[in-house]
């Protein structure tokens, strides 16, 4: 792996926490996907419970991403899913977990956020 800049992607949609690091040629350097837990017999998750689970999963996923050989110091951009649909007013609380993490990382390492 050469020293090109990498991209960090974060998604906290309703039923899965995802974090990935990719190279500009599409090579996947790191890929984390973890389904949220739904209690047996339940039909789904309330937004508050899903948000809580994302907040619990993101630190470990991001720590593992940055500990992957060759990643630290090479993130050139951060991307995040910020809402369920690309229309004005589209909102679900679960997306705030990923958006908060992505904004914090992008600001702290001085890279663009998409």
Residue positions per predicted region:
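Short acidic/glycine-rich loops and adjacent helix/strand connectors
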Residues: 1-114
């Amino acid at each position: 792996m050469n020293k090109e800049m990498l991209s960090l992607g974060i998604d906290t949609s309703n039923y899965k926490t995802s974090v990935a690091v990719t190279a500009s040629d599409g090579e996947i350097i790191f890929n984390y996907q973890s389904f949220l837990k739904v209690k047996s017999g339940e039909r789904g998750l309330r937004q508050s419970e899903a948000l809580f689970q994302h907040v619990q999963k993101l630190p470990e996923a991001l720590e593992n991403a940055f500990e992957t050989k060759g990643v630290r110091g090479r993130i050139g951009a951060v991307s995040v899913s910020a809402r369920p649909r690309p229309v004005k007013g589209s909102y679900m609380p679960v997306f705030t977990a990923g958006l908060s993490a992505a904004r914090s990382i992008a600001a702290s390492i001085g890279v663009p956020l998409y």
